[in-house]
Amino acid sequence: MRVALDRTARRLDGGRVLLGGSPLTVFRLGPGGRRVLDAIEQGDEIPAAAHDLLDRLLDTGTAHPRPGPGPFNARDVTVIVPVHDEDPRPTLEALGAVGATIVVDDASGVPVPAGVLHISPGDRLLRHATNRGPAAARATGRAAATTPLLAFVDADCVPDEGWLEALLGHFEDERVGLVAPLVRSLRGPGAIARYETMRSPLDLGPVEGRVAPATRVAYVPAAAVVVRAAALDSVGGFDPTLRVGEDVDLVWRLVSEGWRCRYEPRAVVSHRSRESLAALARQRFGYGRSAAALDRRHPGLVAPAVLQPWAVAGWTAIAAGWPLAGALAGLAPAVSLRRRLPAMPERDREAVRLAALGFIRAGEQLASCLTRVWWPVALTASFVSRRARRPLLATAAVPIAIGWVRTLGGPGESRSNPLAYVVLRAVDDLSYGAGVWAGALRERRPGAILPRRPGKVRFRSRPRRPPTGARR
């Protein structure tokens, strides 16, 4: 196997220490480990004797695989397309040659015509008499599939050429249970389409990653994923009782059972954006409302922010007009970080750098929460307290301004009118936050609203040997 170090990984102390991964992990390397790291940096094949270290690098997100062709091809894949009141033909036409295609019509108002499928062995059109939701539709499709790999592709998605081949190589690792592509919004002339090209909740960006809770890539959307059938069956498949958030739930259950899940942005699937402001608001509200149901199944993992008290104190001091005190509070953890780092010439500098990065990220989380999940509290505080009003307004305005400026660097068709961007950003954030509060009240679960401290939740992934049936 060939792998590459994560872009954030840093070799220190003459190569004897490696920092990287999400969450951050420190590796102390002996001579053998240093030779393995040298081979990784040179792009060489990693010998079998080094696979224990390689597993640790992959499981912490410190390194990422560079798979070859792998044991599977497109004929080993059944594509399952759940449909409800949509035209699946653009999706089906973009799939190319695969083992089989199964369309599940989840009680569309106008039934999907049988002629949408290119009839070949294994192709099927299945129907639900009543609407049961996308998770149930995917389960129906899975029950009819016989191939070792399953691709779930929503009917509002159009895969780019070569998307499947870019994902299949990852399954040469028998512990990989799921791989997801980059899901980008289709560019269009409308304000919503332009906004979604920059801020789609399905677009996780251009940087690959391991997928696991409490990491940089905490989930992937089920709009398009390829799953090992044995892995899906080992956790009971998608939960049909969840109409939203079922993809997050599945990924977290797979990881909990020891399966590796990967995000591979070299594979691209395009997604049609919502056509109206009301539809966008309903979508974001639904996403927010699913957080409490996920908190019931995975307590502590959906907290809107993970914050240390010192970081909150530091940013509170800055907001109150005491920037020096706030900065000192923000850098205070450098003392404890220094003790945790191994003795090396760069220890002091790295401790300060890590403390500063942690403080900045805490500020980003606070700003996001104040305008998204905590906006009812922030709005109330701005009316009650004049002193709080100015920093809260700045907290709301600065991210919006930065977001709009970023649209200027994109293609011409993605650039937003500033007023349209502000309105859409407000609808996006307020709808999501309202959904979180509605779900928390309905489920009586405050975990989707309250922040937590690092380390308060332990998410353990069971070490796993490839199960029978995982191999080709």
Per-region residue spans from a language model:
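Acidic donor-binding/catalytic loop of UDP-sugar-dependent glycosyltransferases
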Residues: 89, 110-111, 157-170
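Glycine-rich, basic loop-to-helix element that forms the pyrophosphate-binding segment
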Residues: 127-145, 155, 209-218
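Short aromatic/hydrophobic "clamp" motif used to bind/position activated sugar donors
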Residues: 150
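Short, flexible, basic/aromatic active-site loop/helix in glycosyltransferases
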Residues: 181, 196-217
